[in-house]
């Protein structure tokens, strides 16, 4: 390449790459060098890196550019390192011997690590067994501490800074000697800057000593399965051909199901966050707090099944979260238009004025009072304030009084007056008819509401009940969530949204900060659609009889997905990036232009990359033209007197304002091609996509969220009521392309799937203290109905256009991520082969036949190898995940119980809905409040449901088969015990897996309920007829019949 061509290219690329002047490593501004020019670390790819990061990479890193891996050359003023060329510029070593750190942050720091978009930071760190990350020089990176020196005593702070200075002196980066007070303050500031520039999180891969054997065994198991099926297919049981054929089909299905479940767990990872660095980077003393605002959504439907006291505790934990109060807003969706919930929020907002300052003063955890006061721990541990005991007793008494008031509201709501509910001011309650009522919004607390008892502001609390009218589809929970998205966009428009169920309280007050470590990361955050937290539960029996904790899914499957494209969305405990829900695609990574080495001829450069230069240049010019168009539109404001807008809506320009005049956008599209027109969209396209609300459309164009300054919240209520009207979503893309996607009762799977198909990534965050905790149905019938609803949602997705088997192939969804989504929608269909396979042992015992013919010693090796590989896979999976063997076994048992009951019914209900349009009613899972008198009373409570029939039948059938098989062996001699062993083992395998179900039927009294006894008698009568037909007690005659022999003789 010719010199002048290279120079022009460098100038052009430098100008385009450094227009923002943001370091791609630490996110800070790239400052100018001594000559007043923008500092360029790498002259090959011009990857933007600031001087401190450049110097640290040369001294402590791999000395190469993070993007093109070109060896960094020494710049004037930078310290020399081993390997620098002698003729690399003027020698300024005299200036390097006495380097001092500057206030502007241009010095290097000890433990800095550069990051890439996948979170792999190239730092000299070692992973220790206790889970903390230590640098090679011994500084603790993972220890949580407050952002500034306020969290330390003077002695502790001085000791910490002295240690940091000693490390710097040891490396020769600072001079020794006496320092003034001003120098010491500079050192402290530099130390904070150095820590703040560290990455906010890091990826911790599973140790190779644990994951490598696991992967090897998976491959071996796959090979063994191939040989096993080769043997099974080539050696049929000729005397029991139908049984053999059914068993082989079932086994092949199980193998495919195992592949779909196993391979998405190929790349499991862990992640750890650094909350101290988040605070130091975005919460500096004397500066405005730069943490991003968050809108929290809480959804509820029926206050009788979802107790108001549980919902109130969830709201209180949100209001008391450890986050700036002016950056938190809580929206409660009441889809049942219940006056009970409305009154509960009024009482909750009043109690929050005392509860929130108590939590923050004494730093209590958890911040849901019901669960805080019921914890059986030493609550005085680590408490040093002398007033704590007195204040705690007073707060507990106030909470008990608050609880009594809520109970009084619940008791009053049990009997509805004939004329309907009446509000305190005497006006009728608008939601007396739950299926025909207007939209309702009530704002509590916040900047314009009541302050706490200390005079401090509280987070905003908003009650939302969307409009419902006959003839309009409301789309259940998905429709309620979309309504909250629009209301929050009009009132607060936070860039991030936390979704919680009404029974999931915040157990870790720093949970939102944990998610911000990912979402506010300068590299990864732009491409994240959500941060998913695991679900943890209270009130589950120690044995976890029905696998309510779902540990295998949350601690194994989800961590495996985190290493691919991210975990699936599970419906609660998830922090969303608002643009991802609006249907936008993630930003595309900047790719450097390809260049050839100087040793190649120039014509090769032209052939390889030169021809695209003009095209790229034209594209960049048009992009800059588009940006200039937007920049001009940002400066324009226009007042409209349209009835749909608010008369008092302020359009003052601010740093966060990006309100566009949609008519100007349409006029400004002249001269651009169709692709660019579609990217900007005209006013009609905006309205078709988002609906007829100029205020909401304007909010979608604000890159960093927020509202214009001096906006009156009360004046926005009218527009908020408009966006939750029942007809707002008609002829829009809500529920189809944007927001929560409609079409299934498990809207969470569909919503996460669509975002991943667009190329978004997600992150799985597992803090040491669980972020959220909820309640789970420990009763057998309730648990089966919950699993039925999940399975029915998967079946609905399977028969929809969004089925992962055929949707969005060739898109941005990774293949292993697609396998995981396929597994989530096909698993209910496993119930059919599972039911058949669990029936085969009893049939074999009753008929005396078996699915496997007599085999030799060589053939038995494949059976033995298969069993050993299954056991080895389970053991190695437990080894890297930390899951207990009891959790794994309970998961296996409930896989069979749910498979032959709830999943089976879900398949037939789904088929009825698709083929005949028979819709099933959505049943809300009951969230019972805790009862100290009987903590696990629901565990032994029996509730009859048709879901209990198939498992009960299987248990009785296999028990009868065992009795018949043993009787047959005794009657025909002990020579039959050999073949009988395989049949008995098969039958006991079924019975052992169904044992928790059997205990659930017995209840507390260890006796079977009457209705189950009646069903058992009926089934026993049927099997008795079969028994008589088989006649197992009579000896089997192998010779000629006596009657026929007498005739012949």
From Swiss-Prot:
Q: How does it sit in the membrane?
A: Multi-pass membrane protein
Query: Coiled coil as a keyword?
Result: yes
- What InterPro entries does UniProt report for this protein, alphabetically? Cellulose_synth, CES_Znf_RING, Nucleotide-diphossugar_trans, Znf_RING/FYVE/PHD
> Which EC class is this protein assigned?
transferase
Give the knockout phenotype. Enhanced resistance to the pathogens Ralstonia solanacearum and Plectosphaerella cucumerina.
User: What is the reaction catalyzed?
Assistant: [(1->4)-beta-D-glucosyl](n) + UDP-alpha-D-glucose = [(1->4)-beta-D-glucosyl](n+1) + UDP + H(+)
The protein's matches in Gene3D superfamilies, at most eight in alphabetical order, are given as: Spore Coat Polysaccharide Biosynthesis Protein SpsA, Chain A (3.90.550.10), Zinc/RING finger domain, C3HC4 (zinc finger) (3.30.40.10)
- ZnF (RING-type) spans are 23-69
GO MF annotation, one? identical protein binding
Main site of residence? membrane
Which Pfam families does its entry note?
Answer: Cellulose_synt, zf-UDP
Query: Transmembrane segments in this chain: where?
Result: 216-236, 240-260, 832-852, 858-878, 896-916, 946-966, 978-998, 1008-1028
Q: Where is the segment annotated Disordered?
A: 76-98
Subunit description:
Interacts with CESA7 and CESA8. Assembly with CESA7 and CESA8 is required for functional complex and localization in secondary cell wall deposition sites. Interacts with STL1 and STL2, but not with GOT1.
Family designation:
Belongs to the glycosyltransferase 2 family. Plant cellulose synthase subfamily.
Function (record text): Catalytic subunit of cellulose synthase terminal complexes ('rosettes'), required for beta-1,4-glucan microfibril crystallization, a major mechanism of the cell wall formation. Involved in the secondary cell wall formation. Required for the xylem cell wall thickening.
Protein name in UniProt: Cellulose synthase A catalytic subunit 4 [UDP-forming]
Instruction: Tell me which species this is from.
Output: Arabidopsis thaliana
């Amino acid at each position: 390449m010719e010199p002048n061509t290279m120079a022009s290219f460098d100038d052009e690329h430098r100008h385009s790459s450094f227009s923002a002047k943001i370091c791609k490593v630490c996110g800070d501004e790239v400052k100018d060098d001594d000559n007043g020019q923008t500092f360029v670390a790498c002259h090959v790819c011009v990857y933007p890196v600031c001087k401190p990061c450049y110097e640290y990479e040369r001294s402590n890193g791999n000395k190469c550019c993070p993007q093109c891996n070109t060896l960094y050359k020494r710049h004037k003023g930078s310290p020399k390192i081993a390997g620098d060329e002698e003729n690399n510029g003027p020698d300024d070593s005299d200036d390097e011997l006495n380097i001092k750190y500057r206030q502007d942050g241009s010095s290097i720091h000890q433990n800095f690590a550069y990051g890439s978009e996948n979170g792999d930071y190239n730092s000299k760190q070692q992973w220790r067994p206790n889970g903390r990350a230590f640098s090679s020089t011994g500084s603790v990176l993972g220890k949580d501490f407050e952002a500034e020196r306020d969290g330390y005593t003077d002695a502790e702070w001085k000791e910490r800074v002295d240690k940091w200075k000693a490390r710097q002196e040891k490396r020769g980066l600072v001079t020794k000697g006496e320092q003034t007070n001003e120098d010491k303050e500079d050192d402290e500031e530099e130390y904070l800057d150095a820590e703040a520039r560290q990455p906010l999180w890091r990826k911790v891969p599973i140790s190779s000593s644990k994951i490598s054997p696991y992967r090897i065994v998976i491959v071996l198991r796959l090979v063994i399965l191939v040989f096993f099926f080769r043997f099974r297919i080539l050696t049929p049981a000729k005397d029991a051909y139908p049984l053999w054929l059914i068993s082989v089909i079932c086994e092949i299905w199980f193998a495919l199901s195992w592949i779909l479940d196993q391979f998405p767990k190929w790349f499991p990872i862990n992640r750890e966050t650094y909350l101290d660095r988040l605070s130091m980077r975005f919460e500096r003393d004397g500066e405005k707090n730069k943490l991003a605002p968050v809108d929290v959504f809480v959804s509820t439907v029926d206050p009788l099944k979802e107790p108001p006291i549980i919902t109130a505790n969830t709201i209180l934990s949100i209001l008391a979260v450890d986050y700036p109060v002016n950056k938190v807003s809580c929206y409660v969706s009441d889809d049942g238009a219940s006056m009970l919930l409305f009154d509960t929020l009024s009482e909750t907002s009043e109690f929050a004025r005392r509860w929130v300052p108590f939590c923050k003063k004494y730093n209590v955890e958890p911040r849901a009072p019901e669960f805080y006061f019921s914890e059986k721990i030493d609550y005085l541990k680590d408490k040093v304030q002398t007033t704590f005991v007195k204040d705690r007793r007073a707060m507990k008494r106030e909470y008990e009084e608050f609880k009594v008031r809520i109970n009084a509201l619940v008791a009053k709501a049990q009997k509805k007056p004939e004329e309907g509910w009446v509000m305190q001011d005497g006006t009728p309650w608008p939601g007396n008819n739950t299926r025909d009522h207007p939209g309702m919004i009530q704002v509590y607390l916040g900047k314009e509401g009541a302050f706490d008892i200390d005079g401090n502001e509280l987070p905003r609390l908003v009650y939302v009940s969307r409009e419902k009218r006959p003839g309009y589809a409301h789309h259940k929970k998905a429709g309620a969530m979309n309504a909250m998205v629009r209301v929050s966009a009009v009132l607060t428009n936070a860039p991030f949204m936390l979704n919680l169920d009404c029974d999931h309280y915040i157990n870790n007050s720093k949970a939102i900060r944990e998610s911000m470590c990912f979402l506010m990361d300068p590299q990864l955050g732009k491409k994240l659609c959500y941060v998913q937290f695991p679900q943890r539960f209270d009130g589950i029996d120690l044995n976890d009889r029905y696998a309510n904790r779902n540990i295998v899914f949350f601690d194994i499957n989800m961590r495996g997905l985190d290493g691919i494209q991210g975990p699936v969305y599970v419906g609660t405990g998830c922090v969303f990036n608002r643009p991802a829900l609006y249907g936008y695609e993630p930003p595309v990574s900047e790719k450097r232009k390809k260049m050839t080495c100087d040793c190649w001829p120039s014509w090769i450069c032209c052939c390889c990359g030169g021809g695209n230069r003009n095209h790229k240049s034209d594209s960049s010019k048009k992009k800059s033209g588009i940006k200039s168009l937007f920049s001009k539109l940002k400066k324009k404001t226009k007042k409209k007197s349209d009835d749909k807008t608010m008369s008092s809506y302020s359009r003052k320009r601010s740093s966060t304002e990006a309100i566009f005049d949609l008519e100007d956008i349409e006029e400004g599209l002249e001269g651009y091609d169709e692709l660019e027109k579609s990217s900007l969209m005209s006013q009609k396209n905006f309205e078709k996509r988002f609906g007829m609300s100029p205020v909401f459309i304007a909010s979608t164009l604000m890159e960093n969220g927020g509202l214009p300054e001096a906006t009156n919240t009360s004046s926005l209520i009218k527009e908020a009521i408009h966006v939750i009207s029942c007809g707002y979503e008609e002829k829009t893309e809500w529920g189809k392309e944007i927001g929560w996607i409609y079409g299934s009762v498990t809207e969470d799977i569909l919503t996460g799937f669509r975002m991943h198909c667009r190329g978004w990534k997600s992150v799985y965050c597992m803090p040491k203290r669980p972020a959220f905790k909820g309640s789970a149905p420990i009763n057998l019938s309730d648990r089966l109905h919950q699993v039925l609803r999940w399975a029915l949602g998967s079946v609905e997705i399977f028969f929809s256009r969004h089925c992962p088997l055929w949707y969005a192939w060739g898109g941005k969804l990774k293949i292993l991520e697609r396998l995981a989504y396929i597994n989530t929608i096909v698993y209910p269909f496993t119930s059919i082969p599972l039911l058949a396979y669990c029936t085969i042992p009893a049939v074999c015992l009753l008929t005396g036949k078996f699915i496997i013919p007599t085999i030799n010693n060589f053939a038995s090796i494949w059976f033995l190898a298969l069993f050993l590989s299954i056991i080895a896979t389970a053991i190695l999976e437990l080894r890297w995940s930390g899951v207990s063997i009891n959790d794994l076994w309970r998961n296996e048992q409930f896989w069979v119980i749910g498979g032959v009951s709830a999943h089976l019914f879900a398949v037939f209900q789904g088929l009825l809905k698709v083929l005949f349009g028979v819709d099933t009613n959505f049943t809300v899972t009951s969230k019972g409040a805790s009862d100290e008198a009987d903590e696990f009373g629901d565990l032994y409570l029996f509730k009859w449901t048709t879901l209990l029939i198939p498992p009960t039948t299987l248990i009785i059938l296999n028990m009868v088969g065992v009795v018949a098989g043993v009787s047959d062996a005794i009657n025909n001699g002990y020579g039959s015990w050999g073949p009988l062993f395989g049949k008995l083992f098969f039958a006991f395998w079924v019975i052992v897996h169904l044992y928790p179900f059997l205990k659930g039927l017995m209840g507390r009294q260890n006796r079977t309920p009457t209705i189950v006894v009646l069903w058992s008698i009926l089934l026993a009568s049927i099997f008795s007829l079969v028994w008589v037909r088989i006649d197992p007690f009579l000896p089997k005659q192998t010779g000629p019949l006596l009657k026929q022999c007498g005739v012949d003789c």
